């Protein structure tokens, strides 16, 4: 298994992975309408666009993409970052791959320069992120209007 940076050639496979995971794993927490709307925002062109302003990673096992995740600036901030598109293929869930993706993102320069990191967490994944030290933003422990939990982690650094 290797973790490497996303390339444009990965866009189709990453899009398919994300959509399949939403339909398989997240379907217990979200309506079909919500998942269909999400699918429209997870097309290959969306993955390519996301990679222009984030550091986007993929996880490969025997040349098959089995996971992905990205980190980038939070609304252009130099001191805040956000995690995006963290997905693991349903067959590989529960095997530590999601944790490896988070560890990779937490070693990225966008994480290391940030004092605060935010993640829009699905209902399905909120407990996973909480185990890794992310807590409810402003203490709000319910989904927002997008049906996502807003989680955050603070880093105490010497950065200005």
Feature names for model-found ranges:
Residues 109-122:
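Conserved GNAT acetyl-CoA-binding A-motif
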Residues 88, 94-107, 131:
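Conserved acetyl-CoA-binding loop-helix of GNAT-fold acetyltransferases
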Residues 118-120, 130, 135-152:
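Conserved catalytic-core motifs of GNAT/GCN5-like acyltransferases
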Residues 42-58, 82:
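A short helix-loop-beta-strand connector motif used in the catalytic cores of GNAT acetyltransferases and
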